[in-house]
């Protein structure tokens, strides 16, 4: 097993309770028509322990963003501009990766899934707002899930739960919808209490 091939992983696996080791692996198999099927494998999974899902949060934020657009009757290709209300936030009105040169929720979601783009995730997170995000997750049965910060740096602490003013425009740059900055109505503490488990990470070069 891979956990016994590298000495550092072998050490962690030997004392998995101390290191709070948990692994979730999803195998994707495609049939002759390219249709995927998924099979999950877990190792030492414990719902009472904290599990940091990292970029996996890009999936629920993308789904909820599309759902919110549908509620607002806004097309996913509408031009999406981001303003700022404090120094750590970013103003965005251009996107050189899109065909028309403008950002949109659709383009941000494409970038999240194609290259796991953290900046794109930050803009979608800001559109949703922390309260909307957690209220909807709770309604869907994910009461213990916490998504409370951007991944592109800059904002810290409470600033991470203050989300930018955003606006949508049609192709003629006519305003469709405007959303003011949003402030979290409460502090979203983790239901498992203290969840700090380390201060570093390893990658393929380690």
Regions found by a protein language model. Give the residues of each.
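Active-site-adjacent helix/loop patches that line small-molecule binding or acyl-intermediate pockets
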Residues: 2-6, 18, 99-205
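Soluble periplasmic/extracytoplasmic beta-strand elements of cell-envelope proteins
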Residues: 22-26, 60, 81
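Short, glycine/proline-biased beta-turn/loop segments that scaffold the active-site neighborhood
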Residues: 71-101
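Generic short alpha-helical segment signal, independent of protein family or function
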Residues: 66-74, 85, 113, 129
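Active-site SXXK
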Residues: 51-80
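Aromatic-acidic/polar surface patches that form glycan- and anion
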Residues: 50-55, 126, 206
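Short active-site-adjacent helix-start/loop capping segments
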Residues: 32-34, 64, 88-91
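Beta-lactamase-like hydrolase cores
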Residues: 1-49
